[in-house]
Amino acid sequence: MTTMIRDVRDRREERLRGGGVIAGALVLVGGVFAVAGRLGFNPTDDGYILAQSYRILHGEVPHLDFISPRPVGSPIIHLLDFALPLPLMIASRLVTTAELVATAVLIGWLVIGRSPARWRAWEGVAVAASALISIHGFPLMDWHTIDGVLLVALGFVLVQYPRTTVTGFLALGAALVVKQSFFLAPLLGVAMVAARTAPAARLATTLRSLLWAAVPGALYVLVISAFGAFPSFVREITGARPIYGRDLMNEMLTHGDLARSAVVVVLLVALVAADSRPRSWIGTVLRGALTAVVVGTALQQHLQLYGTWGDQLEEIVGIVVLWHMYRRRRVDWPGIAVVGTGWMVSLSWGYAVPNLVAGGLVLLAVIRIWDGHQVATRPSALVSVLVAVAVFGATAAVFVHTRRTDIYRDRPASQLTFPLSRIAPDFGSIRTNPDTGAYLSDMKACIRQMPASKVALLPNNAALYPVLHLHDPLPLDWLWIDEIGGSHAQILDAARSLDRQGDYLVLFETQDASVVPMVGLQPGSAPLASDILGVLHGRQTRCGPFVAVYSPPGAAH
């Protein structure tokens, strides 16, 4: 009877804790969005995923009607953004914020080794701090890496449990449909499952796991093949510039703080000696010092978007994981998975750093440093909570300051005085600087003055297609060199076809949209845009900061 009462009480406590974690996560999503969700906009890559989702909504076939150097899992996921009863750009940023917080919770689940319903108070606060670190100064926009990390974290958690292993491998396989750089995730998942499987069944389990992980990719290929897009899919994927992780390794070797890593190694070696003594307070002090080094590394550059802090974290957390495996005499698969995810995140053309999982790296290091250690104070639980709250407070202060002063390709919050609702209702309450506002106002005026059923805005401005409900006649919404890959000829063929059909407006930037908010009006260069201009024979005119090529309805060439 006593055992039954205790079980009922424990289940009730777990439900309360689980509800507390959910409530805390929702509050954190709301807080992050309130701080950063409506600040800044730049008409380059912000909205690029939404533009591809918009194409799918209008019946276009990926890799056939539009170009993508990666599978289009992210545009499919973010069809959700269009279904929410909110202005599109607000919905997009809210979904992204929720994804980032959910990823932090899942990585916390993996690293702590217990479900959120069984977390102690200080662990929940630490996970909240890790979420802010991982979000750092990254723009709150739909992006492949954010979707991929969420699926990878979900998969790693689910493969820990026999009942959800299949679902876990489906999630890990789906990450490859989002971005092929997550190829290592299913292999790590297989290693996790194989490690807990009896030797006699290991081969069969491995093959079965790989087959489940292959299901999302196989379905993707089957569907696009049914529409005749397989040859172009292969061309676009293989034509993309490969990434081997060299950037991260180079950054760790050239910008990694060797002195900091050396300090970590010395402290860890000293910790081995200190722990050999019974009830040694030195172990607590050394662990506190190591924790300060790890957290200090994360905050040293104020969570800025660009910086070497994430590379340094990857380096020292890798050292901590190796030390922990040596101490425990067993392979730390969750630790390897998180460090490996940091490497996969760094496989990027434009953002080759592990910062989007930096908070998970910090949490991993802290949990492993304190693993098995009992603090020699009576109210140790209270001390742990107070320390965690202090770290969260410091992290939140740095986060808020950075998000208001170092806004992605825009100006500080005090200078964001232009409400983008003037451009389109789907911008909601987002604000930008007056120069970007004037740039977008001129663009909208040009579109109004020269009506056409097909409008292209080159080489940037991807968000404007779904926001202004425009049909882009070219197969790529953002003419960035790495997105183009080997599809130069295909884009020019589409431009020639557009010219023959007529009824189009193509606006060419005479200023680079990426630098408008920072230095005012500047000439930009885009070689492919110049080539497109050369094959269009519509009427050329100057319209605000754009060169317009216009072929009115009924004026086919």
Question: What do these predicted ranges mean?
Answer:
Residues 153-156, 165-192, 215, 337-348:
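Membrane-interface alpha helices of multi-pass inner-membrane proteins
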Residues 95-99, 122, 134-154, 178, ...:
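Multi-pass, polyprenyl lipid-linked donor-dependent membrane glycosyltransferases
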Residues 400-482, 502-516, 545-546, 550:
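Short periplasmic/luminal acceptor-recognition loop of GT-C membrane glycosyltransferases, typified by
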Residues 37-52, 65-80, 87, 227-230, ...:
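Extracytoplasmic catalytic/substrate-binding loops of multi-pass membrane glycan-assembly enzymes
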Residues 94-117:
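Transmembrane-helix motifs of polytopic, lipid-linked glycan transferases
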Residues 152-167, 273-276, 320-331:
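Membrane-interface transmembrane helices that cradle and orient dolichyl/undecaprenyl
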Residues 502-557:
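Aromatic/acidic, Gly/Pro-rich catalytic loop(s) in extracytoplasmic/lumenal soluble domains
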Residues 185-217, 244-245, 271-281, 364-376:
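Perimembrane helix-loop-helix junctions
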